[in-house]
Amino acid sequence: MQFDTDWVRSQFPAFNEPTLQGQAFFENAGGSYTCAPVIERLTRYYHSRKVQPYGAYPASQAAGAEMDEARTGLARHLGVDTDEVSFGPSTTANTYVLAQAFRQFMKVGEAIVVTEQDHEANSGPWRRLAEDGIEIREWKIDPTTGHLDPADLDKLLDERVRLVCFPHCSNVVGEINPVTEITAAAHAAGAFVCVDGVSYAPHGLPDVGAIGPDIYLFSAYKTYGPHQGIMVIRRALGEALPNQAHWFNADTLYKRFTPAGPDHAQVAACAGMVDYLDALAAHHGKDAKEASALMRDQEVHLLQPLLDALSNRNRVRLLGPSDAASRAPTVSVVLDRPGFEVAQKLSEHGIMAGGGHFYAIRALKAMGVDPDHGVLRLSFTHYTSQTEIDQLLAALDAVL
């Protein structure tokens, strides 16, 4: 069955919003549109279940059940146990909680590997542990391509490395990193692995159980959901790290790294993300676990013409691979004008795009790009239409 873009777009109310008509959305990496099931669940929760969950009366029990439904459904798609899925206010906040746990867990002189390719969320919290005597080793990127070479990691690994942190996919380079290969190398050296999946998850939730990292982080609001950070913490590591929650919650894995009460309504609404992914697969006659492949195939089909058009332009530097199959549809280009300025010009042609450094300051500097100049970032996902791609290409012709 051919990918049904019309059906997909019907699941996102933003496409029927009068104030957005005629505008093509190419800033999905900053936050995707929200699917209807999430909005419906959030609305229902505030209408009929906005009470303390897990209590003795029906509304309270329904509230707790819906929160559990979110965790159970996400765990099914992520290939992990239900209690290995935790929620928090954002990925950055979740990483700071994890960094605090590792600060207590590690000894002075032990090491953490971080990359130049990461968004600051999976970099800054770990680097701050240097203040406590933890050695920070930097896995550098290729200054021309932004590529993160696994062979370079081998040179950084030894018995003192306890944790390796890297992105599944950079939010400016766009290249998809070989998580399974990198994780296996880190594990062989005795290190745990933390993967930032924020820029990858919107293009298909990974089978975390299969690819193997000990921690996998992503953001619901960039994955068609509400503003929540979602983290998978595998059982062996989650039980070994010091509890960061109330002492009486220490025996419940999914509570150990949620220091404060979660946003009940938004956690419950995350079940709508699962509703959508299941419906997407069913509509196309696929198993629910095949939803990710459906999304990915459609994105690759739309992405290659954009990459070709940008690669063939003078005075345009494309960051990351020019092959759609090896990257996410998060496309950053360096121009002779500041990225934000070009994004403003594109808006006059009905294109919603982003310009700036996108909290990837270290990556841009490593590639010789002034963060204040920034990049133009064009990012989309599976619900983007061919018509919108054509609109973008025409706008780029006019502006560049």
Spans of features found by a protein language model:
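Pyridoxal 5′-phosphate
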Residues: M1-L400
